[in-house]
């Protein structure tokens, strides 16, 4: 066999020639096979490397996707935890199918020892109106009230005859269980209430709103919602004195599920705040207002076309689209053309009764109505032991505006309660309302101070 060796230059070796020469001579394996084997090894290595790169890239994608999913889950959890008050079922009542043809009845409580002229206007007694509202109930009665003192057993015996209406109403509420009617109560009373305890034993659900922790204030709302169809709203709380010795005013509205549903949403907000010591960051859609000052409900009241909406306070208790009490009061005053009549407990436009900082929001609007628009203003204010002395200064300041002004009219009267033999007061003017030639504001605003 002929041996052929291929040498390279003297300075080095040709690796290919060297391999070929010895492979041919030592093993007899074809050179092409060796080259193919090496190429296959190179290809396998490159394929493995490419697959490894793809695998690492896929793993990175999975990690990124997993991280995004985790972030989304945490975000959803935070949102759902922030929406802490969800509202309740609305029995299928919507803005589209609710009733707007409503009947309204004024109810009031006049203390027994107060007499009026024979030709004076009288309205349905408050106690009779509330009894009638309970007679309409078929499924659920929802009550928001700051106080629960319907039974006067803790007071002096001289009050017992006057408190019979309160005891009768408490008995009617206890009887709802036998009729299969659910009673739900939201109260601002943080301490123990024997009456609420009794009602709880009669199957009532009672929720407390800790307003001190939430706003450092008090719950003042007082209203009933019956079957999401009828409701009461006014100045009276669930206190036997509101049915006997105080001057109260409110309205009963029947077959008005549009407004009742909106008021039910206000109740739902209070109901969901039990045990809460913080204001939720987000409100559920079920708590959003259906109507407000810019888009009021167009309805019929006693066959008369009208507009209506509910307002609320404070601002932190306002879900989307809900108007504030201050906005509602301002709108009523600003839209008055001829007269403004106001009945309220206290008129004290101060930010604080101790710091004596002037609060001009409402007082300024009344002054504008008097001077700029020549609107006639009448004020009926309670005068009792808790009346702040500066109240008289502010009223005198308003009256002084009209001393040298033509067509400027302001009248102010103080409603004085009578002192009983035991030192208690009877006949306190507890009304809170405002009526003009164009609108009515009826609410539970305690006094016009901040």
Predicted regions and their residues:
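Charged, low-complexity intrinsically disordered terminal segments
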Residues: 2-450
């Amino acid at each position: 066999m002929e041996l052929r060796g291929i040498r390279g230059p003297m300075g080095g070796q040709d690796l290919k020639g060297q391999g070929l020469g010895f492979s041919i001579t030592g093993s007899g394996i074809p050179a092409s096979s060796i080259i193919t084997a090496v190429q296959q090894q190179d290809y396998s290595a490159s394929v493995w490397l490419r697959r490894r790169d793809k695998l690492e890239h896929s793993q990175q994608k999975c990690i990124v996707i997993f991280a995004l999913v985790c972030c989304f889950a945490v975000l959803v959890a935070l949102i759902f935890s922030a929406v802490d008050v969800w509202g309740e079922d609305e029995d299928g009542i919507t803005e589209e199918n609710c009733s707007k043809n409503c009947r309204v009845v004024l109810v009031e409580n006049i203390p027994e020892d107060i007499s009026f002229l024979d030709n004076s206007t009288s309205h349905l007694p408050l106690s009779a109106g509330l009894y009638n509202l309970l007679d309409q109930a078929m499924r659920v009665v929802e009550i928001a009230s700051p106080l629960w003192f319907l039974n006067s057993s803790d007071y002096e015996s001289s009050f017992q005859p006057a408190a019979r209406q309160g005891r009768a109403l408490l008995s009617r509420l206890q009887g709802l269980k036998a009729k299969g009617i659910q009673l739900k109560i939201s109260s601002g009373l943080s301490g123990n209430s024997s009456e609420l305890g009794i009602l709880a034993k009669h199957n009532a659900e009672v929720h407390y709103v800790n307003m001190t922790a939430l706003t450092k204030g008090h719950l003042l709302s007082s209203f009933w919602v019956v079957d999401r169809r009828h409701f009461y709203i006014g100045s009276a709380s669930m206190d036997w004195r509101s049915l006997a010795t105080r001057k109260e005013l409110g309205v009963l509205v029947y077959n008005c599920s549009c407004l009742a549903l909106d008021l039910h949403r206000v109740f739902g907000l209070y109901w969901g705040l039990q045990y809460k010591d913080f204001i939720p960051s987000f409100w559920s859609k079920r708590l959003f207002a259906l109507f407000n000052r810019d888009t009021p409900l167009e309805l019929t009241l006693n066959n008369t076309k009208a507009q209506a909406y509910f307002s609320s306070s404070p601002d932190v208790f306002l879900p989307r689209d809900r108007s504030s009490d201050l906005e509602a009061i301002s709108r009523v005053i600003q839209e008055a053309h001829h007269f403004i009549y106001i009945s309220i407990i206290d008129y004290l436009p101060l930010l604080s009764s101790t710091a004596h900082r002037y609060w001009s929001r409402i007082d300024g609007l009344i002054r504008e109505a008097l001077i700029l628009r020549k609107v006639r203003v009448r004020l009926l204010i309670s005068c009792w032991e808790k009346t702040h002395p500066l109240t008289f200064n502010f009223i005198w300041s308003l009256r002084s505006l009209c001393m040298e002004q033509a067509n400027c009219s302001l009248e102010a009267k103080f409603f004085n309660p009578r002192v009983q033999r035991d030192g208690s007061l009877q006949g306190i003017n507890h009304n809170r309302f405002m009526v003009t030639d164009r609108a009515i504001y009826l609410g539970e605003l305690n006094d016009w101070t901040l």
